[in-house]
Amino acid sequence: GHFVIEQTVRNRSGFFINFNGTGGVWRKKCIEEAGNWHADTLTEDLDLSYRAQLIGWRFVFLKDFTSPAELPSEINALKAQQFRWTKGAVETAKKILPLVWKSKVPLRVKLQSTFHLTNNLVFPFILLAAILNVPLIFIKNSGSHDVYFAIMSLFVLAFVSSFLFYMYSQKHIRAAWRKKIVMFPLFMAGSMGLAVNNSRAVFEGLMSRK
């Protein structure tokens, strides 16, 4: 989903995209003009990507080219990776967003950049929603807020957009996409499971904790 849809749409729409650390080719001049690599965030690739684009450099995302990549081999490695990416993205947002909003890029680019760099803030809300599920069950069973719960049930439709996002990305790259999309509930459960880990990363990033 990230590569097939997000990166493709951002690139074609003129929005800022991020280099993912691997599978890319940089011009040496671009890196030097952007101020070289910085070590003040955990996601130096995201940081450099934005600094380069703010001074006029542009990336070209080649969707039809593939490159080998390694995935975490066990759950602790995955949690460490997600923690690093989440905390680093928050650190980068604190560092880069003031520069984005002071720049002369179009308003739509500023808004999209804000959504992009702050999207990990959703994890504390996912965690909060999970915690509140238990008391909500008892409140609902009391029968005193039927209208409220009837209206709130409409928000379940929000999951439809996530499902379509991943369904179309899998359909585009895999002939047997139906076999993969049935794992979507497992993916959502995994995202919920990472909420504690990633929420801690968000707060550490916000508090500039090293």
Regions found by a protein language model. Give the residues of each.
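Long helical/loop segments within the catalytic core of UDP-sugar-dependent glycosyltransferases
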Residues: G1-L42, I75-L107, L111-T114, T118
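Nucleotide-sugar-dependent glycosyltransferase catalytic core
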Residues: E70-K87, R178-I181, K210
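Conserved helix-loop functional segments at active or binding sites
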Residues: K28, D40, F65, L99, ...
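Membrane-embedded multi-pass helical conduit in multi-pass membrane proteins
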Residues: N119-R209
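Flexible loop/turn segments at secondary-structure boundaries
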Residues: I17-N18, P68-E70, P135-F138
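Conserved glycosyltransferase catalytic-site signature
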Residues: L42-D47, L186
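Catalytic donor-sugar/metal-binding loop of nucleotide-sugar-dependent glycosyltransferases
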Residues: D40, S49-P68
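Flexible glycine/proline-rich, aromatic-decorated loop/lid segments
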Residues: G1-E6, K28, D47, L54-R58, ...
